[in-house]
Amino acid sequence: KLLMGTSGTVGVIRLLVLLCFFLSMVITNDVALITFVPLALIIVHKLPKELGNYWFLKIVAMQTIAANLGSMLTPIGNPQNLYLYARAGMSAAELIILMLPYSATSLILLLIWIQLAAAKAPHVCGSEKDKTLLGFSDRKELNMEYLAAYLILFTICLLTVARIIPYQIPLVLVLIYMLLRNRENISRVDYSLLATFIALFIFIGNLGRIPQFSSFLERIMAGRETLTAVLASQIMSNVPAALLLSGFTDNYRALIVGTNIGGLGTLIASMASLISFKYIAKENRNLRGKYLGIFTASNIIFMIFMLILYFFLR
């Protein structure tokens, strides 16, 4: 229904990118990408060939950056925010105010990027373009029981984030519901990605216990918490960076800014970016290198703008 309310290819591209940006604030960057990247790929395949080829890699890179940048505005948008927000004892309002300038600037940059890309897109006559998009009518009937149940469970999870109820309650409720009503989805979990996270967290935990490394980290972090977090995120991803660096400083506001900006840059800077990359690899393994080039270049540009804003706001 949302797609039917847009006009033309650029309108649909803009909508798909903005959905990732805004919904990542509520459903997390990972879930936003899992939801909307496959939808974007379906739509791109329905475009005329030349137009589809033009947007195929660009829209996924745009959605990935949008999800990572949109998610930085709220405590529940991404794991590092949730962890540092809890560790710092901040209120949700404090975190939102801290990250609002970065989020607002990111939105403006995304809209400019879409318009610049649209200006260089191959020209397709309006009637053919609109007909192609209007042909997207493969809709399934919405299961109201699932919708109601997941909304209730989601609300309970939000109450946990707000420190109103203990985390054990949503953990048990979600697990029971999934086992009783939606067991097949348990087998669809990307356990390899979870295993990667677990191994990375164990490695980071062990690294922080090495005396020589700890003293080195304390020296380089003093007064440079944000930049250290940005650089560390490029190597170990921003969530492990948040876990590691939080043990060596109590300047959690600087770490929140640093790990969110640090989600830009390399492919592993944010683990959510790997989700999009896996979709590209699944579609066409030969395009992995080209996508990585587009992704990295655009991420670096956005990171530069975010760092300029950071130095301006200091």
Task: Name these PLM-found stretches.
Residues 93-139, 274-314:
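Juxtamembrane and boundary regions of transmembrane helices in multi-pass small-molecule transporters
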Residues 1, 16, 150-250:
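Transmembrane helical segments that form the transport core of multi-pass membrane transport proteins
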Residues 16-72, 83, 243-256, 285, ...:
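Hydrophobic transmembrane alpha-helices that form the pore/transport pathway of multi-pass ion
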Residues 23-35, 70-78, 230-246, 262-271:
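Short helix-coil transition sites and intra-membrane helix breaks within transmembrane domains
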Residues 10-15, 48-62, 90-100, 251-263, ...:
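Membrane-interface alpha-helices at helix entry/exit sites of multi-pass transporters
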Residues 8-20, 63-72, 131-138, 194-208, ...:
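Small-residue-rich segments of transmembrane alpha-helices in multi-pass membrane proteins
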